[in-house]
Amino acid sequence: VMLSMALSMVVVNCIVMLVQGYDFESYQNIFLASDFQLDQMTDTLSNTNFNGITPEIKGILNKCPESEKTGYVYYSEERHKMEPALLKTWETLAEKNKENWTDYEKQIWEETKADNTVKVHFLGISEAVFDMLEWKGEKCSWDTFKSGDYVIVDYSDKYTEQPVSYYQSGETFKMEYGNGKQKDYGVIGEAMMPYSLDYPYADSVYITVMVPEEEYITQTENQSAMYAAIDAKKGEDKQVKEYIDKNVLKENDMIT
């Protein structure tokens, strides 16, 4: 039986999905993170705005009376000096994937290996987004994570039956920020971001590292988010959409 379902989202006008014998709830948890999503992302990396959800917009969204919860994802690109174990993991992954890599991707790997630093998709996440993560292994608590002493790391081959870990819980991750700050974090777990809230552009050689929202702002001094994810109270979807249209989209037509 094939079922056609139209899902209205702010980030796009309409998504029509064909679902056949599929666990839609599991799909939704990974790929459709919230009822509404706002950002200033574009189809091309060169023209995108990773800081489109400003503090002013966050303030407006946080006051929406019909929303159940609103979460934020912050992004910056950092670099990380690879420990021997991480380098070995990436050497194994490169050998496995090189036949499928483009010449450009192979060049990126050679440069990564030569200077022994890997690109980091560094994400700050609020509690509402933390609750959306897809965990590999034991889940940590928000109360522990929000202390700012820990990071959550992504893992490779995330959509396969045997994903590959970059780090193990209990290991130390040394972060050297682009602004000169340094801090040692404990790795508290491995988790995958919902697809729609993750870094949206094609990339091959990188790791994803997450810290709580407050820690991200403290270390990077960036208060503007990449994404806002809003869940409406039951039966209040229309009211939330009207609130967003009137108070956010009317003032900034770059937000989708």
Locations of the language-model features?
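Basic-flanked hydrophobic alpha-helices used for secretion and membrane insertion
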Residues: 20, 24-256
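Short, strongly hydrophobic transmembrane alpha-helices
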Residues: 1-23
